[in-house]
Protein backbone atom coordinates (compact mmCIF):
# COMPACT_ATOMS: atom_id res chain seq x y z
CA UNK A 1 0.00 0.00 0.00
CA UNK A 2 1.30 3.45 -0.93
CA UNK A 3 0.51 6.39 1.36
CA UNK A 4 1.41 10.06 0.84
CA UNK A 5 1.53 12.43 3.81
CA UNK A 6 0.80 16.09 3.11
CA UNK A 7 2.65 18.14 5.77
CA UNK A 8 4.92 15.22 6.73
CA UNK A 9 7.18 17.41 8.87
CA UNK A 10 4.83 17.92 11.80
CA UNK A 11 5.55 16.32 15.15
CA UNK A 12 2.69 13.84 14.84
CA UNK A 13 2.88 13.41 11.07
CA UNK A 14 6.53 12.44 10.89
CA UNK A 15 5.97 9.84 13.63
CA UNK A 16 3.03 8.43 11.66
CA UNK A 17 5.25 8.24 8.57
CA UNK A 18 7.97 6.38 10.47
CA UNK A 19 5.49 3.93 12.02
CA UNK A 20 3.82 3.20 8.68
CA UNK A 21 7.19 2.65 6.99
CA UNK A 22 8.18 0.25 9.78
CA UNK A 23 4.95 -1.69 9.11
CA UNK A 24 5.96 -2.08 5.46
CA UNK A 25 3.93 0.65 3.76
CA UNK A 26 5.47 2.66 0.90
CA UNK A 27 5.59 6.22 2.22
CA UNK A 28 6.06 9.53 0.46
CA UNK A 29 5.46 13.00 1.77
CA UNK A 30 5.75 16.72 1.29
CA UNK A 31 5.90 19.90 3.32
CA UNK A 32 6.82 23.53 2.80
CA UNK A 33 9.24 23.55 5.75
CA UNK A 34 10.60 20.83 8.04
CA UNK A 35 12.68 21.49 11.14
CA UNK A 36 14.70 19.28 13.47
CA UNK A 37 14.18 16.88 15.11
CA UNK A 38 11.54 15.85 12.53
CA UNK A 39 13.91 16.67 9.67
CA UNK A 40 16.72 14.54 11.09
CA UNK A 41 14.46 11.58 11.84
CA UNK A 42 12.85 11.65 8.37
CA UNK A 43 16.29 11.87 6.73
CA UNK A 44 17.57 8.91 8.77
CA UNK A 45 14.74 6.77 7.37
CA UNK A 46 14.98 8.14 3.80
CA UNK A 47 11.61 9.89 4.09
CA UNK A 48 12.75 13.51 3.95
CA UNK A 49 11.41 15.20 0.81
CA UNK A 50 14.21 16.21 -1.57
CA UNK A 51 12.61 19.59 -2.22
CA UNK A 52 10.32 21.61 0.03
CA UNK A 53 6.93 22.70 -1.28
CA UNK A 54 3.67 21.31 -2.62
CA UNK A 55 3.88 19.39 -5.87
CA UNK A 56 0.65 18.07 -7.43
CA UNK A 57 2.79 15.95 -9.75
CA UNK A 58 3.66 13.79 -6.72
CA UNK A 59 0.00 12.77 -6.46
CA UNK A 60 -0.69 9.88 -8.81
CA UNK A 61 -3.43 7.30 -9.18
CA UNK A 62 -1.24 4.55 -7.67
CA UNK A 63 -1.43 6.22 -4.23
CA UNK A 64 -3.87 4.31 -2.01
CA UNK A 65 -4.39 7.00 0.64
CA UNK A 66 -3.48 10.54 1.63
CA UNK A 67 -2.92 11.55 5.24
CA UNK A 68 -3.47 15.27 5.67
CA UNK A 69 -1.61 17.12 8.40
CA UNK A 70 -2.98 20.07 10.36
CA UNK A 71 -0.54 22.41 8.61
CA UNK A 72 -2.12 21.79 5.19
CA UNK A 73 -4.91 24.11 4.05
CA UNK A 74 -8.06 23.23 2.10
CA UNK A 75 -6.61 24.85 -1.03
CA UNK A 76 -3.40 22.78 -0.91
CA UNK A 77 -2.58 21.81 -4.52
CA UNK A 78 -1.65 18.24 -3.58
CA UNK A 79 -4.93 17.82 -1.71
CA UNK A 80 -6.90 19.17 -4.66
CA UNK A 81 -5.12 16.74 -7.01
CA UNK A 82 -5.84 13.82 -4.65
CA UNK A 83 -9.51 14.80 -4.51
CA UNK A 84 -9.68 14.99 -8.31
CA UNK A 85 -8.31 11.42 -8.48
CA UNK A 86 -10.75 10.19 -5.79
CA UNK A 87 -7.91 9.08 -3.52
CA UNK A 88 -9.16 8.61 0.07
CA UNK A 89 -8.00 11.44 2.35
CA UNK A 90 -7.62 10.95 6.10
CA UNK A 91 -6.90 13.65 8.67
Task: Describe the residue ranges of each PLM region.
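N-terminal leader/targeting and accessory segments in enzymes
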Residues: 1-91
Amino acid sequence: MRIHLIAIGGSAMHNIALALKQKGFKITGSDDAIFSPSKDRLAKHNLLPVKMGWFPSKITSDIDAIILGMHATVDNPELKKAQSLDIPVYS
